[in-house]
Amino acid sequence: EDEIATVIKDIDLTGVTLTPADSYAGTFNGNGHSLKNWTSDNTLFTTLAATGTVKDLIIDKSCTLSFPSDKQYFGFVVGNNAGTVSGVENYADVTIPALPTVANYYGTICGNNTATVADCANYGDITYSGSVPTQNACYGGVVGQITGAAAVAKNLFNIGDVTATINGVAAKSVYWNGVLGWLGSNGKLLDSVNQGNVTVTAHGNSQMLTACGLVSYAGGEVSGCYNGGNISYYAESAEGLADGGVQRTGVAGIAAYIGWSGKEVQNNINDGNITFRAGYSSGYAASGSFTKYAVNVAGVFAAVYNCGLNGCKNSGEINFTMTDIDNASSYDYKAVNNPARQSCGGVVASSWGKLTDCENTGDVNIIFTTVKPQEGVALSAWNGKGVGYQFGGISGGDYHSSQDKSPIEGCTNSGDIHIISNATAYNNNAGGI
C-alpha cells in the first residue's frame, strides 16, 4: 500500500497485451499522460483496494476498446473500486460486440464502486447493435455501479453518445445511461453532467428498459446534476412504425427512478429533448417501486418513490407517442383487477413525494391513439384495454394517488401541453401542472 507508481511520459501500447493487476493497494499516478494505441477488452486493475488510488490517467482516442461479455463488473481502468479513482479520462470509442452472458455493470472508467470516483470523464461513443439480451445488462458512460452508503460519485462528465440497437424484443432488463448505470441504496451521485445523446432502439421490451442521461436507477442521492443530451427510446420494428409493445419502461434526462427514501434531492436540470415512441403497453408488474406504471417518461425523473424534489428544472421538449393502444396484445387492466397508467411529465412522470420550486419550460407533446380503423369497423369495446394516461407540465400524476403524500408547492409550468388521443374507456388525466 506504500507503493507509488508515476507515469513520466505517454505510453505507446501498439502490439502490447497488458496483464491486469488483480489487486492494487498503492498509488498509480498517470501524471496527465496517455495510453496510446491500446487494443483491449480487459481492465488495468481488476480490484483497487481501500488504500489504493488511481489518478490523472488518459486513455487516448487512438485506442481500440470493446466491452467484454463475461464479467459482472467492468471498467477499462478499474473493475472493482474500494479506493479512490480521480482525474481519469477516456477519449476512445467503445464497441459492445455482444451483450453479457452474466448480469453486468459496465462503465468506461470503473465497473463497481464502493468508495470514491471523482473528476472522471468519458468522451468516447459507446455503440451496440445485435441480438436481444440473455442476461440483465447495465451500462454507464463513466461508471457501471455505485453501491453502499460510503460510495460517492462526483464531478463525472460524459460527452460521448450511447447508441444501442436491439434486434428483437428485449426479454431481460437492460439499462443505457450517459454517466452511471446504477446507484444503490444511500450512495451519492453529485454535480455530474451528461452532454451525450442516448438512443435506444428495440422491437419492444417485456422486462425493464431504460434510457437516461445520468443514471437508470437511483436508490440514493442525485443532486446538482445536469443533462444536455437528447434521450430517446424507439420501440418499433422499423423506423417510424411505433408498433412495439413495452412495459416497465423509463426514459428521462436525469434518472428513470429515484427512491432516496424519505429524503430530498435538489437542483437537477435537464435541457435535452426526451423522446419515447411505441405502439402499446403489453403489461407491467402489479407491485414494486419501479414497476407500478407501465411507462414513465419525463424531463428530469421518470418515477419518484418516497422522495422529494427541490429546485429541479426542465427546458427540453418531451415527446410521448403510442399509436396502437388497442392492440390485441395490449395490457388489459380488467384481467388482473389492477389499473395501469402511462405517465409523462415535464419534470416527473409519476411521483410519490413533495415537489418544491420545480419548473418546466419545455413543451410536452402527446400522441396516444389507436391504429386508424378500417371504414365501418368499430373500435373494440375496451378501447385502449383500459390502459389510460396521466400527463402534466410538472408531474404526470401522484404515484399513490394521495395528495397528502405528494404536495406540489412553488412549481411553475410555461411549456405548452399538446395531446392527441382517442382513448375512451379509462380514466385519462392531463393538466398544466
Model-derived features with residue positions:
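Surface-exposed repetitive/solenoidal architectures
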Residues: E1-I433
